[in-house]
């Protein structure tokens, strides 16, 4: 349910052809993979099959003979054959590697390299490497990237910082999805905001007032799933008037594993604000309490957000609210003594741009009769300003009255392509 999928956008190439050090990093990156996951073997075979292309081979080997790439430069044929073999190996082990962040990073790295070198998906593959001594350079002293530092690990593998997504839920609740759709929802009871291989977030809502369609989030449950070498599974639960600065087990980090400090919880305003940092999956979460409701805001790495199966498709952060659960602004029912003009004036003080956040503020103030709802919308906008990688998408505007709010630009997000790729390897 939710918004229909959008066409994947092609990735832009970036960086220079991979060096031996970069290829070795592919091997090092996956050193923490689960024992049944064979991504370590896939990386070792790829590094081995490309050694002759890294300056030590003959000119014939560099040219690769046999057209692996379309218009590629020196070595493109041999490199394309190696990349196709690498991709085939990852597909064969995909089922046992599901949920392994290193595996997903390697899959996207292959895609990037194939695009950079104009490699076709169909064609000859590299012969299996001969069994023999350890790979040259495997023990060269190059430090392995920290498996619990997602941003650092990704940057070393891809030569660029990772992409991030933002989602928020506040007020009525209003949900801003990863794809910049903005919905006002009537969802009642427990609904998943996120449900992927690394993170589960559930919001529980109840009506703002007796007989009202609009609801407000009264409880948030967040599960950080067990990740080898980094964290034990941790559960955080917040309710109105109970915003703890600790996980359910009383801890404030990811546990006693080597990367336990890569998950932490802190506050700058006890009882009203909690921030959870999950560096091992490139994620920051902010939870606030305002006007008797809870607000949720997240910045999360693209690969993490899109690591889910078809059975996990109901996620408000991914598809927005299901059509049957959406409210239009025309459905508001004023409660209390606040007029529309007063509500607009109150919201305008902190939200000068009449965008989705402004209209959500007016909606909430009118339907609740509580001026404190202005704070929830203002905080959500500030989180978006801090979390969005592209500030041109900060302000979203209604397409017309009575229709759910959507992005003014209506650009197809690149993330659809990542999602399609994930489905293809299952």
Swiss-Prot record:
Question: Could you tell me in which tissues this protein is expressed?
Answer: Adult and fetal liver, heart, and skeletal muscle.
Q: Where is this site: Cleavage?
A: 172-173
Here the disulfide bonds are 148-230, 167-317
Propeptide feature: residues: 401-426
GPI-anchor amidated aspartate lipidation sites on this chain? 400
Q: Which residues are glycosylated?
A: 118, 213, 372
Residue numbers bearing the Phosphotyrosine modification = 46
What are the BP-aspect GO terms? activin receptor signaling pathway; BMP signaling pathway; cellular response to BMP stimulus; intracellular iron ion homeostasis; multicellular organismal-level iron ion homeostasis; negative regulation of BMP signaling pathway; negative regulation of transcription by RNA polymerase II; positive regulation of transcription by RNA polymerase II
Major localization class: membrane
Residue ranges for the region (Disordered) are 119-142
Task: State the UniProt keywords alphabetically.
Answer: Autocatalytic cleavage, Cell membrane, Disease variant, Disulfide bond, Glycoprotein, GPI-anchor, Lipoprotein, Membrane, Phosphoprotein, Signal
Q: Name one GO cellular component term.
A: side of membrane
User: What is the recorded membrane topology of this protein?
Assistant: Lipid-anchor; GPI-anchor
Q: Which locations, inside or outside the cell, does it occupy?
A: Cell membrane
Give start-end ranges for the coiled-coil region(s).
none
InterPro entries cross-referenced by the UniProt entry: RGM, RGM_C, RGM_N
Q: Give the Gene Ontology MF terms in alphabetical order.
A: BMP binding; coreceptor activity; signaling receptor binding; transferrin receptor binding
Signal peptide interval: 1-35
Q: Does the keyword Aminoacyl-tRNA synthetase apply?
A: no
Decide whether keyword Amino-acid biosynthesis is in the record: no
Q: How is it modified after translation?
A: Autocatalytically cleaved at low pH; the two chains remain linked via two disulfide bonds. Also proteolytically processed by TMPRSS6, several fragments being released in the extracellular space; regulates HJV activity in BMP signaling and thefore iron homeostasis.
Subunit (UniProt): Interacts with BMP2 and BMP4. Interacts with BMP6. Interacts with BMPR1B. Interacts with TMPRSS6.
Spell out the family assignment given in the record's similarity comment: Belongs to the repulsive guidance molecule (RGM) family.
Q: Which disease is it linked to?
A: Hemochromatosis 2A: A juvenile form of hemochromatosis, a disorder of iron metabolism with excess deposition of iron in a variety of organs leading to their failure, bronze skin pigmentation, hepatic cirrhosis, arthropathy and diabetes. The most common symptoms of juvenile hemochromatosis at presentation are hypogonadism and cardiomyopathy.
**What name does the UniProt record give this protein?**
Hemojuvelin
Gene name for this UniProt entry: HJV
